[in-house]
């Protein structure tokens, strides 16, 4: 299957008909399961992203926000490492979001991510995001109690209202020059178990493990239901969700890379045209440098 068709399959364009179960975490789309076979494609994607980021930075009219959501061990860090490895760090910022601090709890639920949005010309990557407020907080109602919300802000329709708030927030960003791409790295429960065991077996990765990871597995079905509701309610043409099969890491890297490249190419970014006084200064500088004696 060619990449454009793969992206169409992964992008949630008709959220009203979306079913998480229709997306197989182990799907390979006909791609080789041997990572060595796809390394050339990955390398080409990295090079193209590097070029597009240079145009984004020089153009300075657009910001890019990449949202990564997934269960523990779904491969969010790996996507950042392997897909964005060619991007200039000066034009890219990565933010990971953990349990909220006391300061964050004193603000509205979108405040934490709002203050970390990328500026024009830059790429912002959210490793988890404001969507935790309709995922983890929904699965764990005790987290909601910590937010000290007024009674009128809490009720059976709170999640629908939060979905609406998120969509309004993202529409505002889109209208003002932020390209938003959201990726749900879909991993199977069995593959997560294998990756947890691999972490425990490898001393260099044990630091990533938390007993809470095992405890959260007991709520797997609740999380899947929350993800399905979230994607159905918040996948829009201006901020689409992509459901990425993540049991095979390199497949996830390829698809995420292709989605970012496709979206950036759609912006038709060009380097600024130099003319007038600025062009005259460049030509003057060129003449002066050529006139200097070497050595």
What are these regions (language model features)?
Residues 1-295:
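Flexible, compositionally biased loop and terminal segments
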């Amino acid at each position: 299957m060619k990449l454009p068709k793969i992206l169409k399959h992964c992008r949630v364009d008709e959220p009203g008909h979306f079913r998480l179960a229709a997306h197989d975490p182990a799907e390979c789309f006909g791609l080789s399961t041997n990572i060595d076979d796809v390394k050339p494609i990955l390398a080409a994607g990295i090079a193209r992203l590097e070029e597009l980021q240079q145009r984004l930075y020089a153009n300075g009219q657009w910001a890019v926000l990449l949202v990564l959501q997934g269960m523990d061990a779904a491969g969010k860090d790996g996507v950042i490492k392997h897909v964005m490895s060619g991007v200039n760090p000066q034009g890219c910022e990565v933010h990971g979001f953990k349990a909220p601090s006391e300061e964050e709890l004193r603000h509205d639920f979108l405040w934490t991510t709002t203050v970390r949005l990328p500026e024009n010309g830059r790429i912002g990557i959210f490793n988890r995001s404001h969507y935790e407020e309709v995922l983890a907080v929904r699965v764990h109602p005790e987290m909601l109690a910590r937010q000290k919300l007024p009674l009128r802000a809490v009720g059976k329709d709170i999640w629908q209202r939060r979905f609406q708030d998120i969509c309004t927030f993202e529409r505002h960003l889109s209208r003002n020059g932020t390209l938003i791409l959201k990726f749900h790295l879909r991993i199977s429960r069995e593959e997560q178990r294998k990756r947890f065991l691999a972490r425990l077996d490898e001393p260099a990765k044990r630091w990533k493990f938390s007993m809470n990871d095992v405890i959260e597995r007991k709520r797997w079905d609740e999380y899947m239901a929350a993800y399905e509701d979230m994607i159905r309610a918040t996948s829009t043409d201006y901020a689409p969700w992509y459901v990425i099969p993540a049991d095979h890491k390199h497949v996830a890297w390829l698809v995420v890379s292709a989605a970012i490249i496709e979206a950036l190419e759609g912006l038709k970014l060009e380097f600024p045209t130099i003319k007038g006084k600025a062009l005259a200064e460049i030509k003057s500088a060129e003449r002066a440098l050529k006139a200097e004696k070497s050595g």
